[in-house]
Amino acid sequence: YVACDIQWYEPKAKDNDYNNFTELDMDEYGRLIPAENRFPSSKGGKGFKEIADYIHSLGLKFGIHIMRGIPRQAVHKNTPVKNSKFTARDIAHHFSVCSWNTDMYGLKNCEGAQDYYNSIFELYASWGVDFIKCDDIAVTEFRQWDTPYSAYYEIEMIRKAIDNCGRDMILSLSPGPAKIENAKHLAKNANMWRMTGDFWDMWDKLHDMFDKCYTWQNEVKPGNYPDCDMLPLGRLCKHSSYHGPNNRYTQFTKPEQITMMSLWGIFKSPLFFGGNMPENDEWTLSLLTNREYLKMHRETTKAHQHYRSEKNGKGTVIWVANGKKCKYAALFNTKDAKSKIKFNLSEILMPDEKYKIYDIWAGKELGEYRNTFTAEVEAHGAVLIKIY
């Protein structure tokens, strides 16, 4: 999937700062459309159709980011809702707003609201959209007490709109942290949902993900994938207003990058690259294209935390998963210094049998082992192995 992120409808956007209460590109039904000055192929009402067609011609799929609700601009102009007797003002929930973006009002659970969501997904289907990242919806940061959980009814409306639009679309809900007590409702209505707030290249955030993955490990199943968020690798900022002219590459050390990739992979989180791909170095590219890693990510089942022993957040974490005629294990060192990790193979396999072990990141066979395997692991690093 190639996904176009937030505010593709904002003609004055220049960097990662939002222009509050700015004019947005919108059609006569209050539906946001690509800014023509930034996406010239959208002129004449074409939307993202030409871009989607090109991406499809490469054998890839196309996605867009949306905010829940209806543009405030549409409410101020009181645009009609397509195929409905209602208008934008009838369906807007003026107190349901995003705390970090001024573009939208949420929708009431009322007549006309479903019609509006139907109309925008009808439009997205005509463009050839395959993936929707809907933001300010898995959990909101304003008036969370208004509904059983944030945007509960809007999630259901979006699900119905996708089901009725005539095109299959993956639905991803952001931001987190989604609540585990809402797992059944999320699984019924979405394919992905964020377990955390925005994830960036800081060790504390990465370490916290062990807790999140443990909490959600039993909710991973075909069609439902709790989401660890994007992979902040490679060149992360090009037009940031607050990181200087050179902006920056990931701040994660190489061992920390290995830890992140190993945890996301064995947990079966969706994998979305958050850097600027044309500027990838060989190291970053090797993380994204490791065939054995991608095979593990596709094929594993029943991934779970097998062992964790830490003091003040420093120690050892081990995750295991079933593969096809094999097992996988990820050995994580959360200490600030290199450490040896001993893994008892006999706890997940038949004791006293010999098993071959393949190091996925090193790309080599490590030999045959019976009952135990020991690895020396870098500080904040990981060893990811296939056992067969």
What is the meaning of each model-derived region?
Residues 103-108, 115, 163-276:
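Glycan-recognition surfaces
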Residues 368-388:
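C-terminal beta-strand-rich structural cap/linker in extracellular carbohydrate-active enzymes
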Residues 1-144:
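Aromatic-lined carbohydrate-binding/catalytic grooves of carbohydrate-active enzymes
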Residues 258, 264-267, 272-274, 310-350, ...:
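Carbohydrate-binding surface patches
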Residues 3, 60-75, 159-180:
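Aromatic-lined carbohydrate-recognition surfaces of secreted/lumenal glycan-active proteins
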Residues 259-308:
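Catalytic cores of secreted or luminal carbohydrate-active enzymes
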